[in-house]
Amino acid sequence: MVWCCRGKVVKSEQASQTQLRSAGTTNSNTAESGLVQMTTAQKQFFDKILPTVQQVSQKKGIVTSVMLAQTILESAWGTSQLATNANNIFGIKADTTWNGNSYTVSTKEVGNGKTVTVERKFRAYKTIFESITDYGNFFTSTPWRTKNYAKFLEAKDYQSAVSNLQASGYATDPIYAEKLISLIQRYRLYQYD
């Protein structure tokens, strides 16, 4: 069974015509309506995190669709090693300001135009809901972060938010913003803003 982002169901035989090649694709039956397919596992992950993401985003003034896209990208729909072993669905590193548990994992980072694989410590949580709450607090957790992420937190639309997030240095991937926008548009996550 394959689910669409608006909760409509597409029959499995229809979905098999164009199996999800990457994070998600449309088939000829859903392309006309603009709906994008989610697998059952993706929908279960999405439904699990959505209420908490909405609550945190509203409380902290973060654009909801950006948070949702980041969970999809950073955790591979909750299936990444970091997500399954440390409940970290945003890829937040454990720097010197972090007092909690950490989890070390190999990750790809871009520096000086080159992609390298490095070992990094990431924050570890008891639940993914702790990860969501911590993400909401992260951007104002130090005076430096409050200043650095101010434009991100002031953004009222997802395009501005991801642009400001990229400019702040949140991720080393030079096309991080493009990836987030692609997910937001592909899954119509902007409907939650």
Predicted region positions:
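Catalytic cores of secreted/periplasmic lytic hydrolases that degrade extracellular macromolecules
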Residues: 1-193
